């Protein structure tokens, strides 16, 4: 992602954002091939991201061939037309989003059903704390499915943060766009307005 000076990275905001998200995109490229992508649930602990996938997923094959991967956590918010900022300048039309790209090395890549069961147990603890279900372990109930899956841990090497929450410019300009988003009535625009307004709280006009 282009590191624009209009949107300086906020590490603490990025940490909160990633902790709230329930999916990311694994991007892996086999040597001499095209990048493969899969949308997956994840658990992040410190500098490690744990995921699982189907063994037949082409992205898993790409990871096996090349463990240098990117895990992309993103949230599309809204689109706003240029006229909400400047009637003349068409370049002021923009997308609003939040995104963190983690460059990682894939470690502990495993198809062992017990390893997969452990990863799924940690995922369920994170996504459904306190829920009641048959414990995830090898056996007649989960066994056939566990044997089809793989798990891996992604060791984070570096990250790139870009929160384009509101157009480039002053807090007043951003609040103006948030107001127009609320008035638009389009699905998701009210949530986008909430995010934009929260991002400029405490900023000067």
Predicted regions and their residues:
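Short, surface-exposed beta-edge/turn micro-motifs
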Residues: 21-23, 66-69, 149
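C-terminal edge-of-domain segments
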Residues: 107-205
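Catalytic micro-motifs at enzyme active sites that drive phosphoryl/nucleotidyl and oxygen chemistry
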Residues: 14-15, 28-32, 39, 59-60, ...
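Beta-strand secondary-structure signal
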Residues: 50, 70, 103, 151-155
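Short, structured beta-strand-loop surface elements
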Residues: 55-119
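A general structural signal for short secondary-structure junctions and capping/turn motifs
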Residues: 15-17, 59-63, 142-147, 152
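Short, charged/polar surface micro-motifs in flexible loops or helix N-caps
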Residues: 32-34, 42-50, 55-58, 68-69, ...
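An N-terminal domain-cap segment
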Residues: 1-50
């Amino acid at each position: 992602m282009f590191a624009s000076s209009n949107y300086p990275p906020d590490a603490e905001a990025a940490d909160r954002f990633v902790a709230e998200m329930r999916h990311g995109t694994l991007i892996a490229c086999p040597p001499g091939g095209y990048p493969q992508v899969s949308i997956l649930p994840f658990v992040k602990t410190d500098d490690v991201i744990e995921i699982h996938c189907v063994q037949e997923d082409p992205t898993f094959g790409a990871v096996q061939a090349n463990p240098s991967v990117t895990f992309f956590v993103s949230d599309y918010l809204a689109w706003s037309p240029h006229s909400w900022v400047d009637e003349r300048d068409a370049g002021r039309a923009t997308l609003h989003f939040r995104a963190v790209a983690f460059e990682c090395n894939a470690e502990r890549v495993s198809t062992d059903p017990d390893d997969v069961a452990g990863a799924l147990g940690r995922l369920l603890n994170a996504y459904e704390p306190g829920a009641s279900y048959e414990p995830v372990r090898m056996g007649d109930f989960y066994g056939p499915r566990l044997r089809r899956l793989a798990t891996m841990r992604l060791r984070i090497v570096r990250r790139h943060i870009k929160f384009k929450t509101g157009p480039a410019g002053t807090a007043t300009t951003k609040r103006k766009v948030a107001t127009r988003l609320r008035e638009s009535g389009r699905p998701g625009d009210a949530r986008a307005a909430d995010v934009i307004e929260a991002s400029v709280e405490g900023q000067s006009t």
